[in-house]
């Protein structure tokens, strides 16, 4: 439901499945799905590794977006209910 609504919002702008926002959104869906899987299967180490890789990819995209356009970054963080990046 949420995914379809977000996709329809993104498609109204244009064919933007390669946009940073859409990529972060799809990674967030994968992360949530893997997290629920790992709650049931705690010893699934390959899924744990995949989760860490996806988390890293999403973090790199969020760092890129926060440097390029802070307003779009804040808007995306609020829409997806994820925490803001830690700054060093």
UniProtKB/Swiss-Prot annotation:
<dbReference type="GO" id="GO:0006412">
    <property type="term" value="P:translation"/>
</dbReference>
<dbReference type="GO" id="GO:0005840">
    <property type="term" value="C:ribosome"/>
</dbReference>
<dbReference type="GO" id="GO:0009507">
    <property type="term" value="C:chloroplast"/>
</dbReference>
<dbReference type="Pfam" id="PF00312">
    <property type="entry name" value="Ribosomal_S15"/>
</dbReference>
<comment type="similarity">
    <text>Belongs to the universal ribosomal protein uS15 family.</text>
</comment>
<dbReference type="GO" id="GO:1990904">
    <property type="term" value="C:ribonucleoprotein complex"/>
</dbReference>
<dbReference type="InterPro" id="IPR005290">
    <property type="entry name" value="Ribosomal_uS15_bac-type"/>
</dbReference>
<keyword id="KW-0689">Ribosomal protein</keyword>
<dbReference type="GO" id="GO:0003735">
    <property type="term" value="F:structural constituent of ribosome"/>
</dbReference>
<keyword id="KW-0687">Ribonucleoprotein</keyword>
<keyword id="KW-0150">Chloroplast</keyword>
<dbReference type="InterPro" id="IPR000589">
    <property type="entry name" value="Ribosomal_uS15"/>
</dbReference>
<protein>
    <recommendedName>
        <fullName>Small ribosomal subunit protein uS15c</fullName>
    </recommendedName>
</protein>
<comment type="subunit">
    <text>Part of the 30S ribosomal subunit.</text>
</comment>
<dbReference type="InterPro" id="IPR009068">
    <property type="entry name" value="uS15_NS1_RNA-bd_sf"/>
</dbReference>
<keyword id="KW-0934">Plastid</keyword>
């Amino acid at each position: 439901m949420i995914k379809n609504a977000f996709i329809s919002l993104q498609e109204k702008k244009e064919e933007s499945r390669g946009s940073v926002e859409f990529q972060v959104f799809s990674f967030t869906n994968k992360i949530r799905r893997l997290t629920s899987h790992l709650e049931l299967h705690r010893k699934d180490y390959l899924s744990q590794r995949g989760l860490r890789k996806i988390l890293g990819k999403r973090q790199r995209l969020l760092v890129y977006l926060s440097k390029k356009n802070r307003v779009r970054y804040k808007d995306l963080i609020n829409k997806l209910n994820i925490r803001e990046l830690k700054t060093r």
